[in-house]
């Protein structure tokens, strides 16, 4: 959970930029996108094997 507090003399835009950077660093959005839909374990294995084949080449 990212908590960002408004600093004295800081604009809302700067605070929002800091918040976005913090969320990206923690990987919160990436994890939410990954867990958005259920993926069966067999499909996960298939995708993993496919990506590994591409990395070996």
Curated annotation (Swiss-Prot):
Gene3D superfamilies xrefs: Ribosomal protein S8
Q: Does the keyword Iron apply?
A: no
Q: Which GO terms describe its cellular component?
A: ribonucleoprotein complex; ribosome
Q: Name one GO molecular function term.
A: structural constituent of ribosome
Alphabetized, the UniProt keywords read: Ribonucleoprotein, Ribosomal protein
- One family from Pfam that matches here is Ribosomal_S21
Organism superkingdom:
Bacteria
- Write out the GO biological process terms: translation
So what family is this one in? Belongs to the bacterial ribosomal protein bS21 family.
What NCBIfam families would the database entry show?
Answer: S21p
What protein name applies here?
A: Small ribosomal subunit protein bS21
């Amino acid at each position: 959970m990212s908590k960002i507090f408004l600093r004295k003399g800081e604009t809302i835009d700067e605070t929002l930029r800091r918040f976005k950077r913090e969320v990206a660093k923690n990987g919160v959005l990436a994890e939410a996108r990954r867990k958005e839909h259920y993926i069966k374990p067999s499909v996960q294995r298939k995708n993993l094997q496919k990506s590994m084949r591409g990395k070996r080449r």
